[in-house]
Amino acid sequence: MFFVRSEMSRYYCPFCSSRYQFYKNRRGCGYVFCDSFVTPDQAHAELEQTIGRKVEPIRHIKFDSGRQETLWIKNVLSIGLCAAFAEPLEATSIHTTIMQLKHFVYACLGQTQQETCNDGTVDDYNLKNGHLYDTMKDFLVAHYTCGRKDTEFWKYIDSGATSTDFVRSIHEVCKHRVPNSTLFPRQEGSAGWPLWSYVLAGTGALTSEVAEKEVMFNNDEQVGDSAYTYHIQDFDNMSKDLPDNTDYIRNM
């Protein structure tokens, strides 16, 4: 993976031959690639071809994704990047760091050492935060299951070698119906059905035909139209009194 400084541009290439590229219309631009399928020099050349100019100097950053098997051992508590690295997007690490700290402060931290560092609180912390990262892995893996097969990297992804049991089961459900929200992680901080719905629809796992069938409630068009109207009205009622983004930020 490497990052480069770039001028503002209205063009972007979100997915390249060996993984993905950050948006070009940002001040910082980069290309995340898998060195099992492309060399750093090849990735460098592809990035330059995509953005249309030479990139010098360039900074290469190597990483391995994964998490600690045990996040809390005795008096050592791993938080944030010490606990896991999922992907080179700051929002993911910020989110998981906040969730870990929130769990520790509200569910574990006591007035004494024994209240805080007992076997029960430690085991609960390790179980729930390990689950948080594992479900994050499922969510990220699903982003790549888009059926692309034009390079060796995408052929490898399409073979299912990097998929997970959860992603495979959700894709099987999507062939026949819209997955119910209860199928998705319900732990605080985990990606739930709203976020999964965008990924499944965007990658083609959930088709418009299946979604329309679900909305129609067994081909009852009247019920489907009523449900659609209800959701639109509900959205309008919630949003009409909200400030726009600029006003909200100014008043923070």
Per-region residue spans from a language model:
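Short, flexible loop/turn motifs enriched in small residues
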Residues: 9-12, 70-72
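Conserved FAD/dinucleotide-binding core of flavoprotein oxidoreductases
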Residues: 10-64, 82-95
